[in-house]
Curated annotation (Swiss-Prot):
Component of the A-type ATP synthase that produces ATP from ADP in the presence of a proton gradient across the membrane. One of its GO terms (cellular component) is plasma membrane. It comes from Haloarcula marismortui (strain ATCC 43049 / DSM 3752 / JCM 8966 / VKM B-1809) (Halobacterium marismortui). One of its GO terms (molecular function) is ATP binding. HAMAP family: ATP_synth_E_arch. Its main location: membrane. It is found in: Cell membrane. This is A-type ATP synthase subunit E. GO terms for biological process: proton motive force-driven plasma membrane ATP synthesis. Pfam families: vATP-synt_E. It is a peripheral membrane protein. Residues 41-56 have a biased composition (Basic and acidic residues). Belongs to the V-ATPase E subunit family.
Length: 194
Protein backbone atom coordinates (compact mmCIF):
# COMPACT_ATOMS: atom_id res chain seq x y z
CA UNK A 1 0.00 0.00 0.00
CA UNK A 2 1.43 3.21 -1.02
CA UNK A 3 1.50 6.39 0.93
CA UNK A 4 -0.80 7.94 -1.60
CA UNK A 5 -3.36 5.22 -0.99
CA UNK A 6 -3.15 5.65 2.78
CA UNK A 7 -3.63 9.40 2.41
CA UNK A 8 -6.62 8.80 0.15
CA UNK A 9 -8.10 6.33 2.63
CA UNK A 10 -7.63 8.80 5.51
CA UNK A 11 -9.17 11.56 3.42
CA UNK A 12 -12.09 9.34 2.47
CA UNK A 13 -12.60 8.40 6.10
CA UNK A 14 -12.32 12.05 7.12
CA UNK A 15 -14.80 13.05 4.40
CA UNK A 16 -17.14 10.25 5.44
CA UNK A 17 -16.79 11.25 9.08
CA UNK A 18 -17.30 14.93 8.19
CA UNK A 19 -20.35 14.00 6.13
CA UNK A 20 -21.64 11.91 9.03
CA UNK A 21 -21.14 14.83 11.44
CA UNK A 22 -22.70 17.24 8.95
CA UNK A 23 -25.67 14.92 8.43
CA UNK A 24 -26.08 14.50 12.21
CA UNK A 25 -25.82 18.27 12.64
CA UNK A 26 -28.40 18.84 9.89
CA UNK A 27 -30.68 16.26 11.47
CA UNK A 28 -30.24 17.85 14.90
CA UNK A 29 -30.81 21.31 13.42
CA UNK A 30 -34.01 20.06 11.78
CA UNK A 31 -35.12 18.58 15.13
CA UNK A 32 -34.36 21.86 16.89
CA UNK A 33 -36.22 23.82 14.20
CA UNK A 34 -39.17 21.38 14.35
CA UNK A 35 -39.22 21.62 18.17
CA UNK A 36 -39.00 25.42 17.99
CA UNK A 37 -41.83 25.54 15.43
CA UNK A 38 -43.90 23.17 17.58
CA UNK A 39 -43.17 25.33 20.64
CA UNK A 40 -44.04 28.45 18.65
CA UNK A 41 -47.31 26.84 17.49
CA UNK A 42 -48.13 25.83 21.05
CA UNK A 43 -47.28 29.30 22.38
CA UNK A 44 -49.37 30.90 19.63
CA UNK A 45 -52.30 28.57 20.39
CA UNK A 46 -51.99 29.30 24.10
CA UNK A 47 -51.86 33.05 23.43
CA UNK A 48 -54.84 32.81 21.08
CA UNK A 49 -56.77 30.86 23.73
CA UNK A 50 -55.74 33.42 26.35
CA UNK A 51 -56.83 36.30 24.10
CA UNK A 52 -60.14 34.52 23.43
CA UNK A 53 -60.64 34.01 27.18
CA UNK A 54 -59.83 37.66 27.82
CA UNK A 55 -62.23 38.76 25.09
CA UNK A 56 -64.93 36.45 26.49
CA UNK A 57 -64.36 37.75 30.02
CA UNK A 58 -64.56 41.35 28.83
CA UNK A 59 -67.70 40.53 26.85
CA UNK A 60 -69.25 38.88 29.92
CA UNK A 61 -68.24 41.81 32.12
CA UNK A 62 -69.73 44.32 29.70
CA UNK A 63 -72.89 42.25 29.35
CA UNK A 64 -73.13 41.91 33.11
CA UNK A 65 -72.50 45.63 33.52
CA UNK A 66 -75.16 46.45 30.92
CA UNK A 67 -77.65 44.14 32.64
CA UNK A 68 -76.86 45.73 36.00
CA UNK A 69 -77.28 49.20 34.51
CA UNK A 70 -80.61 48.20 32.97
CA UNK A 71 -81.76 46.69 36.26
CA UNK A 72 -80.70 49.83 38.12
CA UNK A 73 -82.56 51.99 35.59
CA UNK A 74 -85.69 49.84 36.06
CA UNK A 75 -85.37 50.07 39.85
CA UNK A 76 -84.91 53.84 39.64
CA UNK A 77 -87.96 54.11 37.37
CA UNK A 78 -89.98 51.97 39.79
CA UNK A 79 -88.81 54.07 42.74
CA UNK A 80 -89.82 57.23 40.87
CA UNK A 81 -93.24 55.77 40.10
CA UNK A 82 -93.70 54.68 43.72
CA UNK A 83 -92.71 58.17 44.87
CA UNK A 84 -95.24 59.65 42.42
CA UNK A 85 -97.97 57.33 43.70
CA UNK A 86 -97.04 58.20 47.30
CA UNK A 87 -97.21 61.90 46.40
CA UNK A 88 -100.59 61.39 44.71
CA UNK A 89 -101.92 59.68 47.85
CA UNK A 90 -100.62 62.56 49.98
CA UNK A 91 -102.33 65.04 47.65
CA UNK A 92 -105.57 63.05 47.81
CA UNK A 93 -105.42 62.96 51.62
CA UNK A 94 -104.69 66.68 51.83
CA UNK A 95 -107.61 67.41 49.47
CA UNK A 96 -110.20 65.41 51.45
CA UNK A 97 -113.16 67.57 52.40
CA UNK A 98 -116.52 67.53 54.08
CA UNK A 99 -117.99 64.44 55.68
CA UNK A 100 -115.15 62.15 54.62
CA UNK A 101 -112.52 64.39 56.24
CA UNK A 102 -114.62 64.72 59.40
CA UNK A 103 -115.22 60.95 59.53
CA UNK A 104 -111.48 60.16 59.25
CA UNK A 105 -110.55 62.90 61.72
CA UNK A 106 -113.09 61.58 64.27
CA UNK A 107 -111.82 58.01 63.85
CA UNK A 108 -108.20 59.10 64.36
CA UNK A 109 -109.15 61.27 67.35
CA UNK A 110 -111.15 58.40 68.92
CA UNK A 111 -108.18 56.05 68.53
CA UNK A 112 -105.82 58.63 70.04
CA UNK A 113 -108.10 59.47 72.98
CA UNK A 114 -108.42 55.75 73.82
CA UNK A 115 -104.68 55.77 74.64
CA UNK A 116 -105.23 58.13 77.60
CA UNK A 117 -107.03 57.94 80.95
CA UNK A 118 -110.52 59.47 81.01
CA UNK A 119 -109.38 62.04 83.58
CA UNK A 120 -106.47 63.34 81.47
CA UNK A 121 -106.60 66.85 80.07
CA UNK A 122 -105.74 66.51 76.38
CA UNK A 123 -104.18 68.98 73.96
CA UNK A 124 -105.11 68.31 70.36
CA UNK A 125 -103.07 69.61 67.44
CA UNK A 126 -103.95 69.43 63.77
CA UNK A 127 -103.62 70.97 60.36
CA UNK A 128 -104.14 74.74 60.34
CA UNK A 129 -106.97 74.54 57.81
CA UNK A 130 -108.70 71.91 60.01
CA UNK A 131 -108.94 74.18 63.08
CA UNK A 132 -112.67 74.83 62.69
CA UNK A 133 -113.37 71.14 62.06
CA UNK A 134 -111.29 70.11 65.07
CA UNK A 135 -112.96 72.65 67.37
CA UNK A 136 -116.41 71.37 66.29
CA UNK A 137 -115.38 67.73 66.78
CA UNK A 138 -113.72 68.44 70.14
CA UNK A 139 -117.05 69.75 71.50
CA UNK A 140 -117.96 66.05 71.82
CA UNK A 141 -114.93 65.27 74.03
CA UNK A 142 -114.61 66.30 77.69
CA UNK A 143 -111.14 67.46 78.70
CA UNK A 144 -109.84 67.82 75.14
CA UNK A 145 -109.05 71.21 73.61
CA UNK A 146 -107.60 72.47 70.36
CA UNK A 147 -104.02 73.51 71.19
CA UNK A 148 -102.62 74.64 67.86
CA UNK A 149 -101.48 73.61 64.45
CA UNK A 150 -99.15 70.89 63.22
CA UNK A 151 -97.60 70.65 59.78
CA UNK A 152 -99.47 67.62 58.50
CA UNK A 153 -101.94 66.46 55.86
CA UNK A 154 -104.71 66.08 58.41
CA UNK A 155 -105.62 64.02 61.44
CA UNK A 156 -104.49 64.77 64.97
CA UNK A 157 -101.60 64.77 67.42
CA UNK A 158 -102.86 64.36 70.98
CA UNK A 159 -100.83 65.05 74.11
CA UNK A 160 -101.71 64.66 77.75
CA UNK A 161 -100.92 67.45 80.15
CA UNK A 162 -100.60 64.89 83.00
CA UNK A 163 -98.31 62.40 81.29
CA UNK A 164 -95.64 62.72 78.68
CA UNK A 165 -97.55 60.63 76.20
CA UNK A 166 -98.05 61.85 72.66
CA UNK A 167 -100.13 60.01 70.08
CA UNK A 168 -99.47 60.91 66.46
CA UNK A 169 -102.56 59.98 64.48
CA UNK A 170 -102.00 62.26 61.54
CA UNK A 171 -102.83 61.25 58.01
CA UNK A 172 -99.07 61.41 57.39
CA UNK A 173 -98.16 58.91 60.11
CA UNK A 174 -100.98 56.52 59.15
CA UNK A 175 -99.98 56.76 55.48
CA UNK A 176 -96.34 56.01 56.34
CA UNK A 177 -97.30 52.99 58.45
CA UNK A 178 -99.63 51.63 55.76
CA UNK A 179 -97.10 52.43 53.03
CA UNK A 180 -94.24 50.63 54.81
CA UNK A 181 -96.40 47.64 55.73
CA UNK A 182 -97.74 47.28 52.19
CA UNK A 183 -94.90 48.56 50.00
CA UNK A 184 -94.17 45.14 48.51
CA UNK A 185 -97.84 44.51 47.71
CA UNK A 186 -98.17 48.01 46.22
CA UNK A 187 -95.05 47.48 44.13
CA UNK A 188 -96.21 44.03 43.02
CA UNK A 189 -99.58 45.41 41.99
CA UNK A 190 -98.11 48.37 40.11
CA UNK A 191 -95.51 46.27 38.34
CA UNK A 192 -97.22 42.88 38.05
CA UNK A 193 -96.67 42.73 34.27
CA UNK A 194 -92.95 43.39 34.50
Amino acid sequence: MSLQTVVEDIRDEARARAQEISDAADERAEEIIADAEADADQIREEREAEVERTIEQEREQRLSSAKLEAKQARLNARRDILEDVHGDVEDALAALEGDRREELTRALLDAAVDEFDDSDELSVYGRASDQSLLEDVLDDYDGATYAGERDCLGGVVVESNESRVRVNNTFDSILEDVWEDNLKAISDRLFEDQ
